Amino acid sequence: MKDLLNLLKNQGQIEEFDAIRIGLASPEMIRSWSFGEVKKPETINYRTFKPERDGLFCAKIFGPVKDYECLCGKYKRLKHRGVICEKCGVEVALAKVRRERMGHIELASPVAHIWFLKSLPSRIGLLLDMTLRDIERVLYFESYVVIDPGMTTLEKGQLLNDEQYFEALEEFGDDFDARMGAEAVHELLNAIDLEHEIGRLREEIPQTNSETKIKKLSKRLKLMEAFQGSGNKPEWMVLTVLPVLPPDLRPLVPLDGGRFATSDLNDLYRRVINRNNRLKRLLDLAAPDIIVRNEKRMLQEAVDALLDNGRRGRAITGSNKRPLKSLADMIKGKQGRFRQNLLGKRVDYSGRSVITVGPTLRLHQCGLPKKMALELFKPFIFGKLEGRGMATTIKAAKKMVERELPEVWDVLAEVIREHPVLLNRAPTLHRLGIQAFEPVLIEGKAIQLHPLVCAAYNADFDGDQMAVHVPLTLEAQLEARALMMSTNNILSPANGEPIIVPSQDVVMGLYYMTREAINAKGEGMAFADLQEVDRAYRSGQASLHARVKVRINEKVKGEDGQLTANTRIVDTTVGRALLFQVVPAGLPFDVVNQSMKKKAISKLINHCYRVVGLKDTVIFADQLMYTGFAYSTISGVSIGVNDFVIPDEKARIINAATDEVKEIESQYASGLVTQGEKYNKVIDLWSKANDEVSKAMMANLSKEKVVDREGKEVDQESFNSMYMMADSGARGSAAQIRQLAGMRGLMAKPDGSIIETPITANFREGLNVLQYFISTHGARKGLADTALKTANSGYLTRRLVDVAQDLVVTEIDCGTEHGLLMSPHIEGGDVVEPLGERVLGRVIARDVFKPGSDEVIVPAGTLIDEKWVDFLEVMSVDEVVVRSPITCETRHGICAMCYGRDLARGHRVNIGEAVGVIAAQSIGEPGTQLTMRTFHIGGAASRTSAADNVQVKNGGTIRLHNLKHVVRADGALVAVSRSGELAVADDFGRERERYKLPYGAVISVKEGDKVDPGAIVAKWDPHTHPIVTEVDGTVAFVGMEEGITVKRQTDELTGLTNIEVMDPKDRPAAGKDIRPAVKLIDAAGKDLLLPGTDVPAQYFLPANALVNLTDGAKVSIGDVVARIPQETSKTRDITGGLPRVADLFEARRPKEPSILAEISGTISFGKETKGKRRLVITPNDGSDPYEELIPKWRHLNVFEGEQVNRGEVISDGPSNPHDILRLLGVSSLAKYIVNEIQDVYRLQGVKINDKHIETILRQMLRKVEVSESGDSSFIKGDQVELTQVLEENEQLGTEDKFPAKYERVLLGITKASLSTESFISAASFQETTRVLTEAAVTGKRDFLRGLKENVVVGRLIPAGTGLAYHSERKRQRDLGKPQRVSASEAEAALTEALNSSGN
């Protein structure tokens, strides 16, 4: 019987749908949902606990309180199903219907819906073309609005206050109709003729000239068209009927002691009903107008509070002074419906416990406490016990399990066998935060975790907890095993390098066993094979570090993948020979014949994975770990105070530095240097001293003297414990050792500036009170930073995931020929990232030719793997065009060729891979390692001494790139441009290093000169910024009036004077607009001209510039006319770390961005206006010149008569990404953003593949702005999805009509997420109210294309294994079948997907 009942209960129909539409509900619709009108504010009878009739919980409207039982008890039992009791009027049904049935309230006076009124831009306001303020005055009964002017002089929509209204009444009588309140607004909305208005607006827009007006009109037009297209009627934005939520969704729960806990909604509904009933009564009584108005206003406020409390005026509070939670609050925010219940649910079959180390586990195992396993696998155990006949019923089985009988444990062991469980550590920052393991039953209460997966989880064993989840269905177990098993996740999806890498003890052990020692026991022995070495070591004949000869048999994998055996005798050490025993066949002996540091081990595992494949690598990783643990135990490495050896030179270096500082102080005292220069120099000095001390210390620590076999004393690498730990990469770094045994160095003040006096002591010597006090600041700041960082980093990840969540690989090849040009990333003198690393795992977009010929060496469409990278290196290829997510032409999603290699698997990416989410996680996960600080120039205490020259590292040929220069009298070049660069090319013509040359640098070589390694080729003063003359002549001062524009500074210590230009802000009124300058004149007093132009040579001086010349002095080409101290020249804060990454992804415009040339042409300066300069660029083709006003304080890099190209920098500053996109195009923007973000991560030593950043950038470039509408339906200035424009243009192309023209637009990630096609996704991200309001008005459809939408509606996501389900549905939809994918069909599709991904 019970089963029958359950059957009846579960008869809910599963709705089939492809899209979700949101719209406005008409009053008729609300009434059709309703099961009756709620007339009374009562809830339940407090004595009988029965719902009051016609009240908010009325059983007649909403259904019975108990299953199949009417309220008065006349009808009970199933047989009366569907009967309506004539006594109490309740239908006999399931109590569950109280969750579904809605009621309604008939409002006595219409009420405006607050969302469409107050959510900006106000939709009601836009439609009526009235301001929000005016509409509110009408709604809240302060003014009348004219609805129908009739034959009078009034206008429709005009506001009248009481006086004006009565005057009009006297004048016109009943000829016009003016009202107030929501009725008036309702009438006005009702009277709108959409078609007529749309036609009028479309005519009006082309005839308008003002930009703002066009914007306003097109906004209105868009809204009107949205209403017309969606079938919503404008008057529905004013409610006449209010729906009432089903009572079980706003429950009233009796607590003990006769009190009740109630949902806030009930209070809000009660207020509405009370006020509505009172208004009805007042209207029946024909009460005075002023009372009715007040009541109507109160009703409006009550409905406002119910829909969105606190949106207008003060929030209504309950009995406990807390604002009541309205309907809008239910859905928005972290605790709202979307983020709390739809996107994140709590799950059953899970447990959590503390983790401990499991050094004996295999990589695919985890130790699960028996207690936990018993609880987690209960149902399985019950089933097994019953199936075996050990227990007769489930109840009996339950008893057995509770008693923990011995047979239960046997069954448990069987159930658990090969049933993977998922382990998750919060915070789950990337997909490796959840992995699958096979459980091994253990005693105790802590979960055991394999040490090698700690890096992926970012786990340590200081009390971390982890959660266990059980995949129940067969499919879930299959996915856990095939995709999530820890052994299948060896490589990190962020950069394609192994993430299963030994650390700490294991590294220490492997390093220790592969080090060599001079004259160790057994040195010089020779062994026939590895077994002999093992015996010699075990019997104590040979030490672990002894140099010996060994004959080894290695099997090496050739190019063809075949193993070839090879026997040779090698020089090695005992430890390395022992280590080779665990190396899999296929790797040569050379991989272990070195001291194994952390980097080398990582490289070894990576190499192993590429050569011998996954299975052997996993076994090898385990063996490495066991070996490492064993030998680090044997080594007995530990730290004692005597390990910190302080170098003898320390005192000498510090004394020398102190003397030099004194020297600088005396220079300052005699006025040779300014305060700022002194500060800089002192800090540079101490930085240098610190470096020297640490060099001396490391040199001291890293070598020790020993006696070799001949009895001579020789140096060998030290076995100092501390040095070994740092050198191997197990723990600690040179910087930390420096603080322990060198000197602590410079410290920063709370505001980030550096304290001039460093801490000269180290921790071994101990700090005195002052030094300790200075140190405390940094330590505290570190802790405060970490807390901030975590939150910010998490928020960045959330925004990234949101913007990229619907990017999935949907096809193999989009067929595009575009791509990005990749060249090695050179910075300063170093190749930071060689070409090989940048193109690895990418697909070539255009054929690569052999340098200097037209022979194709790599055809387009090749996926570049490690072999191809080596080949490109050999052929010395300089640049390659590769396919990129940014240039991919797939409409929805992205194609596998443009993405290239799946970094975590090492082959081409599968269809269905959620590359967007992976990109977001890869960028967000290291976020917590980035710093939060903004550095001032000269900020970080770890700052290196400022560069003041270019010293080349490699020999080669000099190349100068876009360098403008003048030649000094002595033949040296002086740079007079800011974008100049100097590069050194090797004999093949490949660039090996590249340096930026600042303005004023003195360059001692010419283009094409040969230089030797180590030569200094350029010099400059790092602390001041010079202004250099380009002609010979005599100095004449212009506009330099003492006390008005300049002040003569006499250094009080020295009596020397120089002239300093005052900041315009500090000048008296007379000097505000004067621009002091130094101009050059010839002997006759005529202006000299800049070479090659007709522009006079005069140099305008920015604020704070220092002039050391006197009026009338002689200067020659390349001399310095004035200096701008670098400290005072606007200290631009370098935003570092996380905030910088966020700024780039949000595409924020910097405060004072660099100014770029809008067009190519010749520079000239027009008439000046107040405080601004007029820059004119005249194009060379004779078209219209371009003018721009630039503030006077901006330092311009261009002079009159200079040629510039479009997009060249005119005035320095941080770049504005929007300008780069507009003037230089998508690929320049991609290059800029990728490099900027990579710089931040690289500084912290984090590797992220470029394509993740490009993937996010693709999402930021989704929208375009229509510049000409052509014959399309778009309006000029619209922001539309690129795909929409392309589709419509294709359509127009087939009909021979004019396509729309457009410009790409860059949106920040928050904005891009909110402007996605899917309103469900946008609403669950941020600004829920605004998104839903907009979607409802336009009647939006959500086609459930992304991942988030599908999670919200509870479907499989269209990615990974779920893609098969979705494409099967789509196929059936196209065939016109009903959309029910049967289990077998889905399974077939799934197996196919899994098989294809396995290959």
From Swiss-Prot:
Mg(2+) binds at D460, D462, D464. NCBIfam families: rpoC_TIGR. The gene is rpoC. This is DNA-directed RNA polymerase subunit beta'. Zn(2+) 1 binds at C70, C72, C85, C88. The RNAP catalytic core consists of 2 alpha, 1 beta, 1 beta' and 1 omega subunit. When a sigma factor is associated with the core the holoenzyme is formed, which can initiate transcription. Residues 1367-1399 are annotated as: Disordered. It comes from Pseudomonas paraeruginosa (strain DSM 24068 / PA7) (Pseudomonas aeruginosa (strain PA7)). Keywords: DNA-directed RNA polymerase, Magnesium, Metal-binding, Nucleotidyltransferase, Transcription, Transferase, Zinc. Belongs to the RNA polymerase beta' chain family. It catalyses: RNA(n) + a ribonucleoside 5'-triphosphate = RNA(n+1) + diphosphate. Transmembrane segments: none annotated. The keyword Nucleotide-binding does not apply.
